[in-house]
């Protein structure tokens, strides 16, 4: 029987993939993801890899998943909270029809501008409205205006984990019935099942409780159907049903 080491199993919490085998994850990337990755996304992925915070980016397999998902639900009006250099934003923009729209929000425009030339070169900038700054005040204003209720087909959240529940309380009103909200990092480096004495990085330990709280709240929310998947760092899809 092969040992854990022989199977390529990883033990450290905080791994690039939740799969237990590096070789298996690489197989997925090289067989099904990279060969079908559009050239603009490949270019942006390679640019982002040079960024000191490159771990913040959406993985290539998750980008592929988001693209497929958006096409399956025929999304047209979307929102993204947490943009970084824009890899997931680019995946969304490429999947939307030509008249599709994305409201994209991030506290750091500088990172967004790293990917913006790629987005512009791909002819997709017209689909994106970028707002710099905290998202919560924008969401509160949209709800107060009244005209945005139930207007979004798809919303992707990959931002400050300590505000995920605050986002959910607002986004549930903005997504349409039958629409989807995707929360990223809901398995949080695998730390959601780590023992109390696990050697977690400081930021992983800090945000873990917020992720656990979110997961519990989503599971109890009767307004949505949920599906949590081990794609990337874990993504939970919430389909609004009421």
From Swiss-Prot:
It catalyses: (E)-caffeoyl-CoA + S-adenosyl-L-methionine = (E)-feruloyl-CoA + S-adenosyl-L-homocysteine + H(+). It is an enzyme of class 2 (transferase). InterPro entries: Cation-dep_OMT, SAM-dependent_MTases_sf, SAM_O-MeTrfase. Its cofactor is Mg(2+). Binds 1 Mg(2+) ion per subunit. The keyword Phosphoprotein does not apply. Gene3D superfamilies: Vaccinia Virus protein VP39 (3.40.50.150). Substrate binds at residues 16, 158, 189. S-adenosyl-L-methionine binds at residues 58, 80, 82-83, 88, 106, 135, 160. Pfam families: Methyltransf_3 (PF01596). Its EC number is 2.1.1.104. Mostly expressed in the bottom and middle parts of the stems. Induction: By wounding and viral infection. A divalent metal cation binds at residues 158, 184-185. Keywords: Lignin biosynthesis, Magnesium, Metal-binding, Methyltransferase, S-adenosyl-L-methionine, Transferase. CDD domains: AdoMet_MTases. It comes from the Eukaryota. Pathway: Aromatic compound metabolism; phenylpropanoid biosynthesis. One of its GO terms (biological process) is lignin biosynthetic process. One of its GO terms (molecular function) is S-adenosylmethionine-dependent methyltransferase activity. Belongs to the class I-like SAM-binding methyltransferase superfamily. Cation-dependent O-methyltransferase family. CCoAMT subfamily. Methylates caffeoyl-CoA to feruloyl-CoA and 5-hydroxyferuloyl-CoA to sinapoyl-CoA. Plays a role in the synthesis of feruloylated polysaccharides. Involved in the reinforcement of the plant cell wall. Also involved in the responding to wounding or pathogen challenge by the increased formation of cell wall-bound ferulic acid polymers. This is Caffeoyl-CoA O-methyltransferase 4. It comes from Nicotiana tabacum. The lineage of its organism: Eukaryota, Viridiplantae, Streptophyta, Embryophyta, Tracheophyta. The gene is CCOAOMT4.
């Amino acid at each position: 029987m092969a040992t854990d080491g022989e199977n390529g199993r990883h033990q450290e919490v905080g791994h690039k993939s939740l799969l237990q085998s590096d070789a298996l994850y690489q197989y997925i990337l090289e067989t099904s993801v990279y060969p079908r990755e559009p050239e603009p996304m490949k270019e942006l992925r390679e640019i982002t890899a040079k960024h000191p915070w490159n771990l913040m980016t959406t993985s290539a397999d998750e980008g592929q998943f988001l693209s497929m998902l958006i096409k399956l639900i025929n999304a047209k009006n979307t929102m993204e909270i947490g943009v970084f250099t824009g890899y997931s934003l680019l995946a969304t923009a490429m999947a939307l029809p030509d008249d599709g729209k994305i409201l994209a929000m991030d506290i750091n425009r500088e990172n967004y501008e790293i990917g913006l030339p790629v987005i512009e070169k791909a002819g997709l900038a017209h689909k994106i409205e970028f707002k710099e700054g905290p998202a919560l005040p924008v969401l509160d204003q949209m709800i107060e205006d009244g005209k945005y209720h139930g207007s979004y087909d798809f919303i992707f959240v990959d931002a400050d984990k300590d505000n995920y529940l605050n986002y959910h309380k607002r986004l549930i009103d903005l997504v349409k019935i039958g629409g989807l909200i995707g929360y990223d990092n809901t398995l949080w480096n695998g730390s959601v099942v780590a023992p109390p004495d696990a050697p977690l990085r400081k930021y992983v330990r800090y945000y873990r409780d917020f992720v656990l709280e979110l997961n519990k709240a989503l599971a109890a929310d009767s307004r949505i159907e949920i599906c949590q998947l081990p794609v990337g760092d874990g993504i939970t899809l919430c389909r609004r049903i009421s």
